[in-house]
């Protein structure tokens, strides 16, 4: 008889971000191994868009206990710290049920960048949210240490990510352009530090911005030399990775950055700042280059062997990510 995993999330299934991508791939592996996966997300409740950040949904969860009884899960995983995650956490703590959680997003840094909220106010809330979790899954060893530095004292586990190799693979017989092509894939929003990419002045380079978001029209007006191609997924997205000579990752506050390993799987080296996310993902001088001067990182990355970049991406596997997720589930009782 298959066991049921309940994933509690404040993301809708049709959203496109690293968190949703992670769980879709984990779900596929779980189903293959005879697990049943059920989501408790804002779609089950009334919700509104977060002002200024429409991709974030603010739900108003009700009758959580009844929903949990109907689902009857063997394991509960709380993926996000939003209203749905919070309400379920409160119910589980009140009734003595066990669960694990995940820390995917640097909310304290994000809230500071977007709304000016001091991190000293938000880190205690994040720490409190995960306090009773049987296991806290986060992206890398570096993030494990960061959470511990902020007072997390539970069992924290590094949880890797993977790549769909059926979609993200190197170009086959397609000549690269003589003009350097620099591609960035991201939500087009303030906190992503995209100006660092958009303002790059690498001689002769063609810059392509893939993605959508609240700053898109503003950036399109301010940076007419950049090609803004909008939102892309699947094979269409992979085509942009493959056509790039360098994938530029300007963000300084990611916990991981799945787009980097998708680019690597396509044989495209990454240029980034030496900060969390890139430091854990990039093999310096093999799959990418890091430098506080992003233009220099691009220049160095252009010299890398695309075959070695692709080979270096082999360590990222959804099967491995699923094994870590599965092995750190906790029984609800």
At which residue positions do the language-model features occur?
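Aromatic "clamp/platform" in nucleotide-sugar-dependent glycosyltransferases that forms part
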Residues: 252
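Conserved donor-binding/catalytic core segment of Leloir-type glycosyltransferases
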Residues: 8, 174-204, 208
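Short alpha-helical donor nucleotide-sugar binding micro-motif in glycosyltransferases
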Residues: 130, 231-232, 239-244, 325
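Short hydrophobic beta-strand element within catalytic cores of glycosyltransferases
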Residues: 269-272
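Donor nucleotide-sugar binding/catalytic pocket of nucleotide-sugar-dependent glycosyltransferases
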Residues: 124-170
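Acidic anion/phosphate-binding donor-loop and adjacent secondary structure
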Residues: 162-180, 218
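A charged, aromatic-enriched C-terminal amphipathic alpha-helix characteristic of glycosyltransferases
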Residues: 303-333
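Nucleotide-activated donor-binding/catalytic signature segment of Leloir-type glycosyltransferases, i.e.
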Residues: 217-235
């Amino acid at each position: 008889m298959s066991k049921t995993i309940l994933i509690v999330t404040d993301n809708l299934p049709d959203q496109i971000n690293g968190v949703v991508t992670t769980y879709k791939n984990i779900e596929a592996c779980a189903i293959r191994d005879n697990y049943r996966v059920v989501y408790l997300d804002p779609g089950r409740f009334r919700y509104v868009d977060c002002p200024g950040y429409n991709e974030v949904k603010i739900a108003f969860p009700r009758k959580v206990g009844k929903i949990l009884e109907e689902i009857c899960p063997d394991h509960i995983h709380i993926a996000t710290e939003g209203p749905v995650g919070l309400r379920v956490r409160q119910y589980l703590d009140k009734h003595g049920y066990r669960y694990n959680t995940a820390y995917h997003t640097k909310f304290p840094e994000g809230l500071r960048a977007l709304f000016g909220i001091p991190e000293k106010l938000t880190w205690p809330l994040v720490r409190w949210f995960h306090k009773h979790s049987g296991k806290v899954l986060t992206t890398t060893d570096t993030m494990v240490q960061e959470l511990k530095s902020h007072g997390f004292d539970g069992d924290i586990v590094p949880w890797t990510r993977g790549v769909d190799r059926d979609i993200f693979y190197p170009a086959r017989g397609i000549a690269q352009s003589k003009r350097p092509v620099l591609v960035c894939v991201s939500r087009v929003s303030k906190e992503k530090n995209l100006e660092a990419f958009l303002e790059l002045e690498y001689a002769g380079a063609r810059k392509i911005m893939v993605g959508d978001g609240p700053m898109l029209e503003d950036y399109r007006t301010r940076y007419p030399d950049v090609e803004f191609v909008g939102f892309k997924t699947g094979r269409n997205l992979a085509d942009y990775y493959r056509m790039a000579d360098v994938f530029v990752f300007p963000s300084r506050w990611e916990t991981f950055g799945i787009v980097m390993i998708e680019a690597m799987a396509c044989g495209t080296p990454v240029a980034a700042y030496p900060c969390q996310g890139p430091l854990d993902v990039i093999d310096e001088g093999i799959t990418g280059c890091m430098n506080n001067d992003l233009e220099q990182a691009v220049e160095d990355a252009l010299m890398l062997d695309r075959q070695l970049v692709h080979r270096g991406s082999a360590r990222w596997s959804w099967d491995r990510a699923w094994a870590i997720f599965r092995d750190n589930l906790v029984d609800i009782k």
